[in-house]
Amino acid sequence: MYERYQLVLHSRQFEDIRRSFLNGRAAHAYIIEGPAGAGKRTLSKLASALIVCREKRACLDCPDCRRALLGVHPDVHLYSSEKRISVKDMRGLIEQSALKPYEADYGVYIVENAHTATAEAQNCLLKTLEEPPGDSIFMLLALNAGQLLPTVRSRCRLVRMTGFSDELIFRQLQALYPGEEKCRQAAQMAGGNIGRGVALIEKRELWELAALAERLCAEADSLSAAQAAEMLRGAKDRMDELLPLLEERLIRAGDVKSLARLGYVEDAVRRLEENVNPALALDGLAYYFTKGDSKWQKL
């Protein structure tokens, strides 16, 4: 059960939180920032285990730690919404946080996708952050802390989940999937994101997209624009997954040609976000990706 937590358990981010609690300098509210799959929820679970652990160290062995990790501890509360977090949602959290913890010294309140909270909901929470209950700790998980109100950010301690090294992700994948031959390659293609590494192992479709990204980059000098366009069109409905994989592969290569092609991919992402016709955007990417002409970036 605990193999999945080892990477984040030994991370600098968790160590900083652990040390702050041991030294009596814990914050009453944290913003844990990072892309999907970066380990935000795992960090919040481990921090919760640390807070309720009867050994005060996130031993992962005592009943309190186990219940916190399983999401069944009465003093650890996870708030998640498929839609934007509303004032009503936030008021429910605030009312719960006003109650005394059942067993632990603190109640822990984890808000997933906090960046989706409406301005009204954030202002509702702000009053609690300004005068926090002494026995409550809040953890706001967000893709980008900049999407939260400045007044909310100023009352929280920011923890950034940055990328892990390929080697650390490889070891984590090996622990999770003993004997799996794809662990090394998945770690290299994960781009520092453990969630993506896991998805590459578990989801055949994503692995095939990663293989397509590898082929496009490896054969870019010999492919014709028509061949590259055909390859891209075959994945036209999954560009939101393929283009980041292409970017990671080009960054990993790091040579002059790859970095130039990275610019073309970034331009394609921008064009798609601006609702340019997808077929035109992909055909343009295929042409400049294989020809290496910089004019497209100036259009």
Residue ranges: model-predicted function:
Residues 98, 123-140:
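Conserved catalytic/switch belt of AAA+ P-loop NTPases
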